[in-house]
Swiss-Prot record:
The gene is bof. It comes from the Viruses. Modulator protein affects the P1 c1 repression system. This is Modulator protein. Keywords: Activator, Repressor, Transcription, Transcription regulation.
Length: 82
């Protein structure tokens, strides 16, 4: 089965991309909406959250935006430090 990779474009997930834009990384949902990954422009990536039982949109709604902002910032800094 071919994996599909989706760029975040709208809705709740778009807010996560706005947090990531400040650090020059892109947020994508991966594996049929079961994980969030962050990508640098050179293609290097880091899995932010892997939702085993929820879809990405439901998993995102389970946490406050302030909490997501900190998760995105922390992971962007780690990704850019590599």
């Amino acid at each position: 089965m071919k994996k599909r990779y989706y760029t975040v474009k709208h809705g709740t997930l778009r807010a996560l991309q706005e947090f990531a834009d400040k650090h020059n990384v892109e947020v994508r949902r991966e594996g049929g909406s079961k994980a969030l990954r962050m990508y640098r422009p050179d293609g290097k990536w880091r899995t932010v959250v892997d939702f085993k039982t929820n879809s990405v949109p439901q998993g995102v709604r389970d946490r406050a935006f302030e909490e997501w902002e900190q998760i995105i910032i922390d992971n962007a800094l780690l990704l850019n430090a590599d």
